[in-house]
């Protein structure tokens, strides 16, 4: 994988992969026009709306594995935002398992 240094570019890449992954999984996707706020996109499937924040997973310096270790903000928790985690090495996505 080509290394991407620009953090904004990393986020853009993750979001583009997220959109196509969501399409492949039967969702309609509506993206945020700005780069700030508690959500990146809204995905609709079977009449249900899912508020999504896409996060690029990072490697721990002590481990070769990627992980998503970012917590939702209070606003995201109140809105019911779900994290969709992007692995930049494999280009795969998965839903985060959120606690309460």
Predicted segments, located by residue:
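Acidic-basic catalytic patches of nuclease active cores, encompassing PD-(D/E)XK
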Residues: 1-32
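Short beta-strand-loop-alpha-helix junction that forms the active-site gateway
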Residues: 8, 54-66
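Conserved catalytic cores of phosphodiester-cleaving nucleases, focusing on short active-site segments
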Residues: 18, 22, 41-43, 47-58
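Active-site metal-binding core of divalent-cation-utilizing nuclease and nuclease-like domains
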Residues: 24, 28-38, 42-46
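Structural signal for conserved beta-strand scaffold positions within catalytic alpha/beta enzyme cores
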Residues: 31, 53, 85-87
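Short connector loops at helix/strand junctions that flank enzyme active sites
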Residues: 36-38, 47-51, 78-80
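Domain-level recognition of nuclease-like catalytic cores that cleave nucleotide substrates
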Residues: 69-70, 75-100
């Amino acid at each position: 994988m080509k290394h991407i240094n620009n953090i904004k570019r990393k986020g853009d890449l993750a979001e583009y992969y997220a959109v196509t992954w969501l399409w492949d999984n039967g969702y309609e996707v509506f993206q945020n026009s700005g780069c700030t706020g508690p959500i990146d996109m809204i995905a609709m499937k079977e009449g249900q709306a899912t508020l999504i924040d896409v996060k690029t997973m990072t490697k721990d310096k002590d481990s070769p594995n990627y992980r998503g270790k970012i917590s939702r903000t209070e606003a995201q928790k109140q809105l019911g935002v779900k994290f969709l985690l992007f692995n930049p090495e494999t280009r795969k996505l998965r839903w985060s398992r959120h606690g309460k």
